[in-house]
Amino acid sequence: MRLRFTKMHGLGNDFVMIDAISQKVTITPERARKLADRHFGVGCDQVLVVESPDNPDADFRYRIFNNDGSEVENCGNGARCFAVFVRQRQLTAKSDIVVETAAGLLRLHVLDDNQVTVNMGVPVLAPAQIPFVTPHEQPEYPLQLDNMEITISAVSMGNPHAVTLVDNLASFPVKTLGAQIETHAQFPNRVNAGFMELISRQEVKLRVFERGVGETLACGTGACAAVVSGIVRGLLDTTVAVHLPGGSLSITWEGAEKPVMMTGPAKAVFHGQVKL
């Protein structure tokens, strides 16, 4: 069969979008891996699938496959693309969209110029729920890598994140240390590794080594986790501009039991068909 798809990106974090409602298709991990292959497939960081929801409170089900075929709980940049995609495909005319994910419900609000605000939910700091193996919850934790010890914060935004403060982000060995953090034994489900440089209380730079993907141009959940970690440490204000290699996001968090709000762009690049 021929599969219709749309290529989209959120700040360079790129996606193959699949409408599995108007075309009957099942995306398996193997199919996702082939679609995501940049040499032999379409090529992307993640494959995002629109399905009919099981939850009656949701408009759609939102599934996320990394380019290694693994299915994950959440993707913030993908959520913005998802909201724009379902409107462009005329699957809905709503500007407020509720989607069902493996991590729960996400609420998306489409603004002008394809800017989207995503209610990313309340961040989780309890180690057992991230999951992160440690005796007690703390703002910071030591983490022993191959040849050094670093300090991290551990946050779940529906998916696990370890955030490290660095002095010079441009020269920091993100790929080397990111790979060690991703597969660290204290994170039983692996982890996304974020590296944050503070500019001011309202502005940071961030690079993210994503679980199952590697370093990407942008990571929405990573930006949220980084801001939460900075606020918990007393280093950041409630609204922060996060500058990623692919562009900038605005992240707001008003503290414990409050949801994190993320605003940023989503853009369609091209439409196509591929033989499965």
Curated annotation (Swiss-Prot):
UniProt GO BP: lysine biosynthetic process via diaminopimelate
Catalytic activity: (2S,6S)-2,6-diaminopimelate = meso-2,6-diaminopimelate
Keyword list, A-Z: Amino-acid biosynthesis, Cytoplasm, Isomerase, Lysine biosynthesis
Location of this chain's protein in the cell: Cytoplasm
Binding site for substrate: N13, Q46, N66, G76, N77, N159, N192, E210, R211, G220, T221
Active site residues according to the UniProt entry: C75 (proton donor), C219 (proton acceptor)
Pathway membership, UniProt: Amino-acid biosynthesis; L-lysine biosynthesis via DAP pathway; DL-2,6-diaminopimelate from LL-2,6-diaminopimelate: step 1/1
Positions of the record's site feature: Important for dimerization: F270
Marked site (Could be important to modulate the pK values of the two catalytic cysteine residues) residue numbers: H161, E210
GO terms under cellular component: cytosol
EC class (word): isomerase
Family label: Belongs to the diaminopimelate epimerase family.
Subunit note: Homodimer.
Function according to Swiss-Prot or TrEMBL: Catalyzes the stereoinversion of LL-2,6-diaminopimelate (L,L-DAP) to meso-diaminopimelate (meso-DAP), a precursor of L-lysine and an essential component of the bacterial peptidoglycan.
The protein, known as: Diaminopimelate epimerase
Organism of derivation: Teredinibacter turnerae (strain ATCC 39867 / T7901)
